[in-house]
Structures are given as structure tokens and as C-alpha cells.
A protein has these predicted regions:
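Conserved C-terminal alpha-helix-loop-beta "cap" of PLP-dependent enzymes
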Residues: 297-379, 387, 419, 425-430, ...
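Short loop-beta-helix segment that forms the pyridoxal 5′-phosphate
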Residues: 24, 57-61, 65, 78-97, ...
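N-terminal entrance/gating region of PLP-dependent enzymes' catalytic architecture
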Residues: 1-71, 77, 267-268, 395-481
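Active-site C-terminal subdomain of aminotransferase-like
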Residues: 215-316, 320, 325-327
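Conserved PLP-enzyme active-site core in the AAT-like
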Residues: 94-255, 317-318, 330, 347, ...
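Gly-rich Lys/Arg/Thr-decorated short loops/hinges at beta-loop-alpha junctions or inter-strand turns
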Residues: 47-59, 77-81, 110-112, 140, ...
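Conserved phosphate/anionic-ligand binding catalytic regions in large, soluble enzymes, centered on
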Residues: 217-230, 234-235, 279-283, 430-451, ...
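Long, charged amphipathic helices and adjacent flexible linkers at domain junctions
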Residues: 147, 254, 384-404
Length: 550
């Protein structure tokens, strides 16, 4: 074994980082470039007063964080038009799977075991749903939503709004038809798009999920980011994860706490429908503060700028004789190029989404500027148009409802105001820069300063999760070494870095055990023994893996 000083660790990490190649990515697929306000980066992301706090089981020492998370829930509910929101989930794929499980558990009829998924959903989301559905006996039907056929065996459906290819469709009639067949609908959506698009709530969806990453959290090669989940009152006792509620203390003062905990795994155990425990709270706080700092007007300005630049690119390509797949879009277009563009894109250090049929997807984001549009037009051999246009989607889908009206989103728009607000909340919380936190459980770990420093290096933070493998050699080398070290530490032959939390690790392990028994022809071996002293996620994970608990 080798012992490294902190300085040597940073040098070793820098060597990993230097093997990565940072290009500007227009890949989209749920992940977008964002500008992190420095007041948030410096005073939350790099501040141990925020990143060393423990799970807020004790509300008395967590009031600052609980307020920041309540802001996140308010952001999500206002954006989606649905009254109940949690704070938060692990990623969009997990959130979609949780929505599917929630709908399934809310269905009384035993014959309802089919779930419809639009091919317009992000591919990685569909893959997560495949994994989560099989142990529960849920049958997935993946098709174009226009080909959906409703019958009594279907309990729910998932639609992407806007789609992974950028298309914006009016799902009102489809959702209404689903309701007539007692089928629940979840929309996977985008927070920035929803600032100017009609809300899922107004479309009468039962739930909405998505990734909050583009609200001030870097790519990080895929994470960590906070996912969001909102739903109707009907599901408030079935929604997964933490819900922050407003209450009063014994003196009658306003106080915040985790609400409706009796539905969660640490209380319901094997009767829980989800193993979600803590989940990306620091990132949820960053996204909520992004919304607080920008406020509704500036967020809509960012959205309109993104939509306008996307329109300029679309119009330029069309004028150059290139067919755009969809006429209605927010930030993403798909088209079939008619020139050899690869070398030009490489020279400009741009990444685009490449489909199997040779078509290209380009997603515009907050970091995109006019010069980028000019260069992209040049790459595909067309002249740029100066045409300006907003709301490049059907008029009936333009948002007219209120947005982020709460006072907290309309007060702190200067650096000084924001700095003071962040500090005020920080002082209401207990963290390692105040005292030790002797609460045990699964979350007792030190986030050392030396660990946090490299996280903000561009070579790590600015890599899109679907960047070509030749651009992420540093990450791949880091993963290889980490897997080797963890295997030696645990005495196993190999390990997986895929699970996004301890609870997801349990679930993954149980799926491996289940797959082994199935491969040996022992499908009947489906009982999982869990001691009473086990963490609540253990029995919940076993149920999700299709096992019974004793």
C-alpha cells in the first residue's frame, strides 16, 4: 500500500484530470451547460457549513437547510404546476422509475401490470425503467406515443416533454384519453423549458419528473445532480423521498420539518414502496439557490434566449436546404446533415449528439452565445440567419400561469443580498464546522477539503456524461483504479460504481443475488432475511428486487 499526503493526492488527481479532454457539448439528452453563480459556488458548494451537514432528522438543528429544500420544492411545484413535490431524488431515470412504481402501487386491479413508455424519452431513462420493472412483474411497452393503445391491462404511461429529440407535442388529448381508461400519466420534463411552457399540471398529468442539473450544477460526467418529482394530492402519501413541511414549534413560531415520514422506508420498512433515503440534497440546494438568485424574470429571459438561439440555428439550417425533424422545439433540434462536418466540429472543439441513422442532435443552453451559432452554421455549411423568434411551439402550449411568485424568489438578486441570505440559513444548521455530529447511521463520512477541491476543476466538472470515450480517459482510468482499490478493500473480485447511493447499492446487490438464483433454475428462492436492526432501506430494497422479507 502507498500513503499519500494531501498535496500528493491533489497531484495524482490532477494527472487523472489532465487525461480528460474538455469540449463544448451540445449533446443534451437531459444534461446541459450551465453558469454557476459564483456567490453560490463559493458560499454553498465550497462551504463546509453546507456540505458537511447530516440528514435533517432533527429539525431543531436543520432549519436553514430545510428552508433551502422547501425553496426547492416550491421551485418544482411552481414549475410543474403540481402541488406536491419532494426534495429530492437521485437522477431522472430513478425518478421516472419511482413514478412507475408509485402508479403501480396505487393501482387496485391485479390485471393492470403494463406500463407505456414513449420512444421520445431519454434512452438512459428507458434503460433504468427496464431494470426496475422486471423484478416487480411490470411489463413495459415502448413505442411512439401516437401508437399507444389503451386497455384494461395498462396502469400508467411516461412521456417526455419536450422529447429527447426536442419535439414539443400537445399531450392534452392523449392524457385525457388515458384518464378515461384509468391510466396514470407521468411527464418527464425540464425546469428551464417549463418557465415558458404550459405546465404538466395544466395538461392534467398525474406526476412530473426531471433533472434539476441545468439550474446551476455542472455536468460532472453525469452527476451528482438532484432530480425532481412532483405529483397531485392523490399521491401525497405514496410519493417517494423527503417532503419538507411547514409546522409550528411549542412556542407557536413557524418551524420546518420532514413531513409525512410514516410512508418512508425508515418507518414502513418492507411495507415501503421506495428505498429512497437521502438523495443529492446539496445539489438540490444549489438548484434552489440558482432560482432564488435569478428569480422568475431572469429565468424566463434565459429560457427565451435559449429558444431564440435554437430558432436561429434551425432557420439557418432550413434555409441551407437541411431538413429539421420537428418544427416545434425549445432548446433541441434534430436534422440530417448533407456535408462532411466531423473534422470541422472537432476543430471547433464541439460535441454533438450522433444518432445511429446519421442524424445530428444539437441542444442549446445557457452557456451558448451568438458566436457558437455562427460556428455551428459554418460547420454544417450554411449561412446564419438573423431572424429572431420566441415561443417556437404551439400557442396553446405557451405558459400563461403564474411562476415563482413566492417572496423568496423575488428578493435576493444582488450578490450581497444573496450572500447574506445564504449565511443566514447556514447559521441555523449544525455542521462539522460547528461541532461533531454523533448520529451514526450510514452518513457518517468526512467531506475533506482536499476531496472537494478537484470537484470544481473543469477537467472533471465540464465533461458531458455522453462525451465520446476518447475524451474521458482520465475518468476511465480513475474508475479502473477505484474499482481495483475497492475490490481489494472488500475482498471481492470486482465491484460496480453504478449505484448512486447506499440504498441503490443494496438494490443492485440483491438484483445480482436474484439473477444468480434464477440462472441456476432456483426462481423459488425469493425470501430475503433482514434483521430488525437493519437500516430501513434494506427491507425496502428487497421488496423492490422482487423478494419477500422475513
Amino acid at each position: 500500500s502507498t500513503n499519500y499526503s494531501e498535496e500528493e493526492v491533489l497531484k495524482k488527481l490532477k494527472k487523472y484530470a489532465q487525461k480528460n479532454t474538455v469540449l463544448k457539448s451540445f449533446i443534451g439528452q437531459g444534461y446541459y451547460g450551465t453558469i454557476i453563480p459564483n456567490v453560490i459556488k463559493r458560499n454553498i458548494f465550497e462551504n463546509p457549513g453546507w456540505y458537511t451537514q447530516y440528514t435533517p432528522y432533527q429539525a431543531e438543528i436543520s432549519q436553514g437547510r430545510l428552508e433551502a429544500l422547501l425553496n426547492f420544492q416550491t421551485l418544482v411545484s411552481s414549475s410543474t404546476g403540481l402541488p406536491i413535490s419532494n426534495a429530492s431524488l437521485l437522477d431522472e431515470g430513478t425518478a421516472a422509475a419511482e413514478a412507475m412504481a408509485m402508479f403501480y402501487n396505487a393501482t387496485n386491479a391485479q390485471e393492470k401490470n403494463k406500463f407505456l413508455i414513449s420512444t421520445g424519452c431519454h434512452p438512459q431513462t428507458i434503460e433504468v425503467l427496464k431494470t426496475r420493472a422486471e423484478p416487480l412483474g411490470i411489463k413495459l411497452i415502448i413505442d411512439n406515443e401516437n401508437e399507444f393503445i389503451f386497455d384494461n391491462s395498462i396502469f400508467g404511461m411516461l412521456l417526455q416533454y419536450p422529447s429527447t429529440d426536442g419535439n414539443i407535442a400537445d399531450y392534452s388529448n392523449l392524457i385525457a384519453d388515458a384518464k378515461n381508461h384509468e391510466i396514470f400519466t407521468c411527464l418527464a420534463s425540464d425546469l428551464l423549458a417549463l418557465s415558458i411552457l404550459k405546465t404538466p399540471g395544466e395538461l392534467d398529468a398525474d406526476a412530473c419528473v426531471g433533472n434539476a442539473q441545468r439550474f446551476g450544477v455542472p455536468f460532472g460526467f453525469g452527476g451528482p445532480h438532484a432530480a425532481f418529482f412532483s405529483t397531485t394530492e392523490k399521491f401525497k402519501r405514496k410519493i417517494p423521498g423527503r417532503i419538507i413541511g411547514v409546522s409550528t414549534d411549542k412556542y407557536g413560531n413557524r418551524a420546518l420539518r420532514m413531513a409525512l415520514q410514516t410512508r418512508e422506508q425508515h418507518i414502513r420498512r418492507e411495507k415501503a414502496t421506495s428505498n429512497i433515503c437521502t438523495s443529492q440534497v446539496l445539489l438540490a440546494i444549489m438548484s434552489s439557490m440558482y432560482a432564488v438568485y435569478h428569480g422568475p424574470n431572469n429565468i424566463r429571459t434565459i429560457a427565451n434566449n435559449v429558444n431564440n438561439l435554437c430558432h436561429q440555428l434551425s432557420s439557418s439550417l432550413k434555409d441551407g436546404g437541411i431538413k429539421i425533424f420537428y418544427k416545434n422545439f425549445f432548446d433541441t433540434i434534430r436534422f440530417k446533415p448533407n456535408n462532411d462536418w466531423e473534422k470541422l466540429a472537432h476543430n471547433e472543439k464541439y460535441n454533438f449528439r450522433i444518432y445511429k441513422d446519421g442524424s445530428i442532435g444539437i441542444s442549446i443552453d445557457e452557456t451558448t452565445v451568438q458566436e457558437d451559432i455562427n460556428k455551428i452554421c459554418n460547420i454544417f455549411g450554411v449561412l446564419k440567419t438573423n431572424e429572431t423568434s420566441y415561443y417556437n411551439f404551439p400557442k396553446q402550449l405557451k405558459r400563461n400561469s403564474s411562476y415563482l411568485e413566492h417572496d423568496v424568489f423575488n428578493r435576493y438578486h444582488s450578490e450581497t443580498e444573496m450572500l447574506r441570505y445564504i449565511h443566514k440559513l447556514e447559521t441555523k444548521d449544525l455542521s462539522l464546522n460547528t461541532s461533531m455530529i454523533p448520529l451514526g447511521s450510514c452518513t457518517m463520512k468526512l467531506n475533506a477539503t482536499t476531496e472537494m477541491v478537484p470537484v470544481t476543476w473543469p477537467e472533471f466538472s465540464d465533461i458531458h456524461p455522453f462525451a465520446p470515450l476518447e475524451q474521458v480517459r482520465g475518468y476511465l482510468s480513475l474508475f479502473k483504479d477505484l474499482k481495483s482499490w475497492l475490490s481489494k478493500l472488500t475482498g471481492f473480485d470486482d465491484c460496480s460504481l453504478q449505484p448512486n447511493s447506499g440504498a441503490q447499492g443494496e438494490y443492485t446487490g440483491l438484483l445480482v443475488i436474484r439473477a444468480y438464483h434464477n440462472s441456476c433454475g432456483n426462481k423459488h428462492r425469493n425470501i430475503c432475511l433482514v434483521p430488525d436492526s437493519a437500516h430501513g432501506t434494506n427491507p425496502a430494497s428487497a421488496i423492490m428486487a422482487g423478494m419477500s422479507v422475513e
